[in-house]
Amino acid sequence: MNDLSREDLLQKIRLLELENAKLKESKSAVSTVSDQYEYDAKYPKIDEYFSSDEYKRYGRQMIVPQFGSLISQVKLKKSKVLFIGAGGLGCPALLYLSASGVGEIGIIDDDLVDISNLHRQVLHTTESVGIHKCESAKRYINKLNPHVKVNTYPFRLSNDNAFDIIEKYDLILDCTDTPATRYLINDVSVICGKTIVSGSGLKTDGQLSILNFHGIGPCYRCFYPKPPSPGSVTSCSDGGVVGPAIGLIGITMALEAIKVITDFYTDETFKPFLSMYSGYPQQQIRVFKMRNKQANCAVCGNNPTVLKSTISDNDIDYAEFCGRVNPNVLAPELRISVQEYHNYINSSQGENSILIDVRPKEQYEITKLPNSINIAWDPTFIKADNIDSYLPSNFDKNTNTFVMCRYGNDSQMATKKLIENFGFNEVKDIKGGINKWSKEIDSKIPQY
């Protein structure tokens, strides 16, 4: 029998994940009947809509004129909302939408709770570390509001499962942070006729928009026909994020979702917009009018080229479409391991070398290796014609020079520039950066 290719194996894994999810759903359906009897006994309805508990629970929002009284609460209860991502955006949005009385929620996220998530992902607790985020979120929601049904999908959204999942829900909340996933969510939602509430956040800023509103509003591809270059995309782990800033975006996503579900927006009154939030120096929210649906859009335009078949058949590789960052910019001989560097600096040759740390100043101030020099990749290395002013006055470009960053990515680019632009002759990148140093050499160096 021929060996399966990596792509074939991944395809089989994705199909097995989907089959497993369907089996869980069927098993859940069996237990749901008895659960429903127990629920009905505990919360008997006092009319065709709600129990006494629900009237008390939601009363404070039903009396708000803009909300829309009883009929809007009924619309919330009948709605099914899918959250793609249970992280910094998804957690606050889940918290407020489940509390508001959405009837059924789906959560898809293949990630596990990590302690580094807890400062901003407010549904997860210290006890949740190590379990799937969607399961952690479900536990919290079940305690918060027993009237909400929660479905979990502890795997990654893909071409193979996206249609089966998204078509079950009325509204999609895109709480992800990668362009490839955003394009997949957009394309499948447009084809399925679903409105998307989309948010993003990084550092102290964030933005929010409503996409494909009732099929008449612009979609993500209308705004961004081409993805950003891979090198320009910064993740939370690289760029950092202040919890309340991204939390505010998640909360506003929940409010916009309520407005969509309760028909506050209509086909006549909805205008495409982009809300942009800045947390520093002075908090502000600016709202920009966006262009309408584009006739030449690849998925929602007059002659679409992105179709259900092209997605389901994996004719579109979203990671390839958005570009892949090459993890190995340098030739192998220009890189060394942390152990090799450790051995070198503890040898007789180590005294005649220099270590350049290219992390941002804020990261360098958290922790650093002794005798290193901080010259940040961005903005210093990127913009500089030379770095002579940062180096000792007697520095010789034949000196053995080592370059370190946080994970071993920026340091490769800096090493390349030192050789090609600055004329350094003996330069090596330290693979894995200071994070790897902490794991393998010195655990007293904190991982952050």
UniProtKB/Swiss-Prot annotation:
One of its GO terms (cellular component) is cytosol. One of its GO terms (molecular function) is metal ion binding. InterPro entries: MOCS3/Uba4, Rhodanese-like_dom, Rhodanese-like_dom_sf, ThiF/MoeB/HesA, ThiF_NAD_FAD-bd, Ubiquitin-activating_enz. It is an enzyme of class 2 (transferase). Its main location: cytoplasm. Keywords: ATP-binding, Cytoplasm, Metal-binding, Multifunctional enzyme, Nucleotide-binding, Nucleotidyltransferase, Transferase, tRNA processing, Ubl conjugation pathway, Zinc. GO terms for biological process: protein urmylation; tRNA wobble position uridine thiolation. SUPFAM superfamilies: Activating enzymes of the ubiquitin-like proteins (SSF69572). The active site is at C236 (glycyl thioester intermediate), C405 (cysteine persulfide intermediate). Binds 1 zinc ion per subunit. It comes from the Eukaryota. Its EC number is 2.7.7.-, 2.8.1.-. Pfam families: Rhodanese, ThiF. Its cofactor is Zn(2+). Pathway: tRNA modification; 5-methoxycarbonylmethyl-2-thiouridine-tRNA biosynthesis. Residues 349-446 form the Rhodanese domain. SMART domains: RHOD. ATP binds at G88, D109, S116, N117, L118, H119, R120, K133, D177, T178. Plays a central role in 2-thiolation of mcm(5)S(2)U at tRNA wobble positions of cytosolic tRNA(Lys), tRNA(Glu) and tRNA(Gln). Acts by mediating the C-terminal thiocarboxylation of sulfur carrier URM1. Its N-terminus first activates URM1 as acyl-adenylate (-COAMP), then the persulfide sulfur on the catalytic cysteine is transferred to URM1 to form thiocarboxylation (-COSH) of its C-terminus. The reaction probably involves hydrogen sulfide that is generated from the persulfide intermediate and that acts as a nucleophile towards URM1. Subsequently, a transient disulfide bond is formed. In the N-terminal section; belongs to the HesA/MoeB/ThiF family. UBA4 subfamily. This is Adenylyltransferase and sulfurtransferase UBA4.
